[in-house]
């Protein structure tokens, strides 16, 4: 069983030198720089490091976890150490998910180039592998781990230890019989290809064999006609033709003779079921398939909150890495909190906290570099400007000079249109969202009330929440950091018909016994140079839906805290839906989420809110929903809203959905699982007891969850065979989340893997669900095998 990488590992000069090992400095901070010896392992898939050249080594990283390699000039940390460490000798290993980057500095430019070229080559080889190649590589990795003495052979004792590592509990006599059957050389050990045969016997899938034989006349093969029947009857391929069946046979049948005879063997059938064509996610939804010519407000837009933070909201690190990660995962709206910095250079950080600071110009340069690497559709810079006049001018200069032609600085046709432009019209453009001077605005005097029902404990919570919220157009009751009695708050914005705009917010007057944390007047003077860069996305305060309809325009946008947005959905859900058919809304997390936790974005999407900003640095259920939602449509960051969320006469209310909606019933038979990993390393020696939980997220009436029983001591090939039933009123807004857990009767179940997708992207029939980690990284070959059936209308379980 030769690894797919063996040819390159034995012929490529860079990889040969990497296998010998080299000393490099591992850099974590300005004060932590340690010499370590790094070596590529013989499997070509892992890099180990040791403190000494001949010291005991431990794993550093796996090639499959690496996203890309950057040179030293692109590293914030290495750039800050140029006086000590030459940038030309440094490089950065960037990992998938949320794992911190690894900064390394070699002893010479040549050695740095060797590692950069070699790692690039290995990453390219891994990312180009298909499912079967990944499985072969996975087997090769396990063989390497099981072969303790590295003699290229595995004794039965080594196989037994390996089975335990692979989450397999098996009768010793049965395991030995499989071992003997695979040992064709009768040497008492298994070599490469013998181990493959042992694995095939171990993973023989009776449920797939039974399905195969139910459509095969002779039980040995599927003819073109039989396979066509299977695709049409079970897989619900509406446009199934003999041409489609033949194309799939050519793609997945491993034997040349089978391809010539137009038949599919059992191995080919299993290969099809495990492929992207057999995946639960419809391949037709993977590329850009939606109409991209509608106004921006007709789309859900992937959005990030406090993008510069890679940790918590109080003491976390600010880094351009936050922008890189957000943009590369398809995020199209990023937030930039800008404050006066030293030497006349604006800085970005979470104001009034201990978060670190980065230069505004570095953020802009990062956005310019990464904005369109994943998607060509427009990026929105949500500016929260707290700078002086002078530093606002500096901001405007950086935006103009660094972004150049990428920056949208005028309307597309030079005149004010009647609706927002489309993503297609704004391809590869960067838009600025922020405050804007309007000479025509009249002097207004407004009275705004603290939200009713927020007395006492809730009022105190709201006041504390406001301490950490920095939206450019905050809600009136959240403008001042205070704990106060319910009362009116008076503000008087002054719009001067000159070159600047001065907004004066009057601090509320405290009553006896109330605690004011800040009574200073807040003044913001807006610079025309910066104001002129805001074209289609002028930030305005939200007062009421009636006020917005009467006084605001389509090119204006309001921001809502999650607290207020959820309240509006409950109290005026249909008005919110109609508001979002003609104007953009941005929702941001509560200021109480100082740990950078997230809310469920689905609740806001239900009302048509376009920009639901997430703390993307924090993994969890909420980000699974967000990632799953934007996985469709090419991962471009824009998803077209359902028609009833685009119709300005819509009667839809997310809290009380009524007809006409095409309600559906979903039947899911959870059949089996394959190669489920044991992720909780603290439970050494235990084998997982897996169960599958299925969750529906959508309108409140559709939200539901069910789970299977657990299978004891089998993470390798558990079988459930259980059917779950869900009834969904508004499938257009529904998301499905499949979660595999390790049952524990003494404590909380441990997470193993998940997969989340939109209802509209789900394929019917026999499908594999390829699991992802908490960080959204593939756990290949871990999967669950299910049967999906969708029926029109609401049916009972007996159906």
UniProtKB/Swiss-Prot annotation:
Residues 26-53 are annotated as: Substrate binding. Substrate binds at residues 433, 435, 559, 586. It is an enzyme of class 3 (hydrolase). Residues 134-169, 170-205, 206-237 form the EF-hand domain. CDD domains: C2_PLC_like (cd00275), PH_PLC_delta (cd13363). The active site is at residues 305, 350. Gene3D superfamilies: C2 domain, EF-hand, Phosphatidylinositol (PI) phosphodiesterase, Pleckstrin-homology domain (PH domain)/Phosphotyrosine-binding domain (PTB). Residues 530-646 form the PI-PLC Y-box domain. It is found in: Membrane; Nucleus; Cytoplasm; Endoplasmic reticulum. This is 1-phosphatidylinositol 4,5-bisphosphate phosphodiesterase delta-4. The lineage of its organism: Eukaryota, Metazoa, Chordata, Craniata, Vertebrata.
